[in-house]
A protein has these predicted regions:
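Generic N-terminal amphipathic, Lys/Arg-enriched alpha-helix
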Residues: 7-22
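Active-site loop/turn elements of alpha/beta-hydrolase fold enzymes
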Residues: 16, 52, 130
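Active-site-adjacent betaalpha module
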Residues: 1-10, 43, 55-181
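A positional/architectural concept
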Residues: 19-22, 28-50, 54, 62-66
């Protein structure tokens, strides 16, 4: 199946941190990330967050941290590919989800390398393009293109949310729809 299913999804948020968003159009990427995280919380979709060297780059930005589900795991990392961190492959596998929805900073480095590794592990990987960013538009474009060429499905916030909902009869429809108005 090529559409997202809330029961089979895990959200992986990559490095949306205090010092990394400063060089970006942070209002857009943070607001989009908040929408996906809020929808995941409403739909009981598990969320894992990574932080690249938080001692130097700061923690996850507060507006995003404020909407994360209570059981969200925040994983410190130094590898660009999050799956290279000790126990990360096992942590993701422990959720038993086949679809990984990934987004964050920087598109062409950490998001790209992690998405490639997830594909190699056999996951269906969906990148939320409008919730990703790079300091440079060219690198952003190349990162998205490289992921797509590798087999990652490129999506956006609204597509993901409405695929998770499936229809207006979903009991969480109004709550999730309100996130994009």
């Amino acid at each position: 199946m090529n559409t997202l299913n809330a029961e089979n999804s895990l959200v992986l948020i990559i490095d949306i941190q205090e010092r990394l968003v400063g060089a970006l159009d942070k209002d857009i990427v943070v607001s989009k990330a908040v929408k996906v995280a809020s929808a995941a919380k409403a739909l009981s979709i598990p969320v894992v967050v990574t932080e690249q060297y938080p001692k130097g780059l700061g923690n996850t930005v507060e507006p995003l941290k404020a909407v994360l589900p209570e059981n969200t795991e925040i994983v410190e990392k130094t590898s660009f590919n999050a799956l290279l961190e000790d126990g990360m492959k096992e942590r993701i596998a422990s959720y038993g989800k086949k679809q990984i929805v990934i987004f964050g900073i920087e598109t062409h480095i950490c998001v790209h390398q992690t998405a490639a590794a997830l594909l190699e592990e056999g996951y269906d990987v969906y990148v939320i393009k409008d919730a990703c960013a790079s300091r440079n538009k060219y690198e952003f474009k190349q990162g998205i293109e490289a992921m797509q060429q590798n087999g990652v499905k490129v999506s956006c916030v609204e597509i993901a949310l409405f695929e998770w909902l499936k229809g207006a009869k979903n009991p969480k429809f109004k709550e999730v729809q309100a996130l994009i108005k």
